[in-house]
Amino acid sequence: MAYVKGGVWTNVEDEILRAAISKYGLNQWARVSSLLARKTAKQCKARWTEWLDPTIKKIEWSREEDEKLLHLAKIFPAQWRTIAPFVGRTAHQCIQRYERLLAEVAGEVEGEDASAVASAPATEGDQFPETKPARPDAVDMDEDEKEMLSEARARLANTQGKKAKRKDRERMLEDSRRLSQLQKRRELKNAGIDTRLSKRKKNEMDYNADIPFEHKPARGFYSTAEEEHENDSERLQHKQMHRTAADAPGPSQKRDKATLSKEDEEKKKEQQKTASAQRTLQLAQLDLQDQISKRRKLNLPEPQIQDQEMEEIVKLGAQGEALHKRYADGVASSLSGDYDDKIVDDSIRTPQIQQSKVKTTIEEIKAMENRSVLGKRTEEEVDDEAEADKDGFAIPKLPSNKAVTSVSAGSDIGGATPAGMTPIKRDALGLVGSVEATPVSILRQKLASLPKPKNDFEITAEDEEEDEEADKEKKPTDNLPVDKGEQARLKRIAEEQERQEALKTRSQTLQRGLPRATVPEVTYNDAIGQEVVALLREEELRFPNKGDSVALMQSEFSLDDLVDAETLIEMELMEGDEQEVQEEGIKTAALPGTVARSDESEEEFKTRVEIISDQLVETLTSLAETCQTEETALVDKFKAYAKRQATLSKKLTSRWSQLESVEVEIAVFSELARMEEIAIEQRSAALQEEVDWLVKKERAAQDKYRELKVKEQAAKGGH
């Protein structure tokens, strides 16, 4: 016969369940149930969530919890797993308490302590044994229970599996390797050999030595980037001077750099993809948060008038209207007033009526269960649910004042309750005096009597600008001494501006950094040629080449004069024919070594140009061949000298480095000798002080011994 799992939980099963959960957690219920032969995974989970969980409250219910439970039961009927988190109890506890409250109102049972009911032991026929206390263990357990207990002990004792043991073994090996490496480095360091654990690759970080994403703050008020750049450049030059040919990178290193650059590019692409995806996700989350924040909770006001009150008002109004119509034409018509449309919208809360809220709520639930039309809620219930406060409680209903009508036409105050009177009186005939003014109405009258504001203001921005200028003048950095580096930087900027201004007055050749043209010795008859020669000579005098000892001349023309002259030249060029000017220039131009002829035709001129060009090409070719021959002969001749120079340079570099190291050692040992001399003097003085102190103490002890000896002899002689 197959055994059906389930039934009452015993104390042994509870302890096994707690131990299994501590090992396997709250997700592997199949493994947990494998330790319990009589329980399934679902039953184990239910036992934990309904009874064994330490967060479950097993004390008696308070009045606030009862109110919250009844209110949520109206909003979420039969949804106990939804109600349980709000109340702070389990779903089964909520069901039991709800049924017990209904039974108490019906008079079936008397009020008892909830903890006493919950602590009642489970029986074999109990429908929910997971919610009851465990049954005590029998003195003589069954064989299957003993087997289950022994198996659970054996399995729970093995706290480490194969993987955990392997991880522990690897961790121990790693610790031993690290300690041995540390001891090796310590011994080498004591021997004077400094070693590193590993060589870091490019774009890698040692998180034990470096600080990731570190941004150091700037030092001082002025930037020292230029000085650091100069120091780096000088340091680089110094390193390049002492670098030998053996330090040149080999083909393997070049390949490593190429592979690293490719890997860096791939990493950058992957980082860009992930960054774009993360940015899209963040934008989507921000949009979702904006939409959630825009959807506000719908808070409806509490109904000011109930159905019963409305019926009473309608009945009273119908009776009054009938009486008014009955005596409208008679003499007594003046004795009754017209009270139509006198219902005021102002809400006045009266003192709360002391009554049992739990009892009232239970009666409402009973009425809701007994109504004929199921599934439909009244407007009163909907308003009650909408008016629930933030803690889940419904605001208690108070007697409404909608039944009270407005005061007489002469009174302009509504909703006040002076001297404990009825808030608003029905006085169509004006029999009652006007209500006294409240402090709020008095304040409103005084505010209304104030003069109207005038909007004739003028805004002057000059004072603000002056204040801003004064604030700028009063900077905290004005009292600080000016940095010399900052002064040099400002001076360089001013000199650069002056140089740019002076450069604008020079010719285009100097502005663009082109080679200068030589001043021809030919005398021109036309005015343009003479002016060009004069400009070239003046430029040589005003802006000589480097190394020329020629006095500078001040410019006779200002920048405005040069701009005007350039404008006139452009206007004159625009008026003439550009192609005609070019043809005339080609005809009148003379090649180097020739003289231009005015009677020469265009074809003769082209033929002469081709002949001279061929001659120039042949001459240049022969010169290039001669230079190459001479260069080859010189290389063969000075090859031994070049090799000798490289060898001597290498030896000189090595000797220089040795000399530097020897000088450093001499300086270090000299300083060490000086410090040792000082230390010897200090130690000698300290030792001398100790010796003097010992001598002094020894003398004092000898004197004391002598005195005691004398006293002893005197004492013996007296006897």
Swiss-Prot record:
Q: Where is the composition biased (Basic and acidic residues)?
A: 167-189, 253-272, 471-487
> What Pfam families does this protein's entry cite?
Myb_Cef, Myb_DNA-bind_6
What residue stretches are annotated with the HTH myb-type domain? 1-56, 57-106
SUPFAM superfamilies on file: Homeodomain-like
The superkingdom of the source organism is Eukaryota
One cellular-component annotation, GO? spliceosomal complex
Has keyword DNA-binding?
A: yes
Q: Which InterPro entries match?
A: CDC5L/Cef1, Cdc5p/Cef1_C, Homeodomain-like_sf, Myb_dom, SANT/Myb, SANT_CDC5L_II
- Name the coiled-coil region(s): 252-286, 687-716
DNA-binding region, residues: 29-52, 80-102
Give the UniProt subcellular location, in the record's own words. Answer: Cytoplasm; Nucleus
Just give the chief location class: cytoplasm
Region (Disordered) residue spans:
113-282, 376-398, 446-487
Which GO biological process annotations does it have? mRNA cis splicing, via spliceosome; mRNA splicing, via spliceosome
Q: Which UniProt key words apply to this protein?
A: Coiled coil, Cytoplasm, DNA-binding, mRNA processing, mRNA splicing, Nucleus, Repeat, Spliceosome
Q: Where is the composition biased (Acidic residues)?
A: 459-470
| CDD domains registered for this protein in UniProt | SANT, SANT_CDC5_II
Query: Which family does the UniProt entry place this protein in?
Result: Belongs to the CEF1 family.
Explain the purpose of this protein. Involved in pre-mRNA splicing and cell cycle control.
The annotated subunit structure for this chain is: Associated with the spliceosome.
Protein name (Swiss-Prot/TrEMBL): Pre-mRNA-splicing factor CEF1
In its UniProt entry, the species of origin is given as Yarrowia lipolytica (strain CLIB 122 / E 150)
Q: Which gene encodes it?
A: CEF1
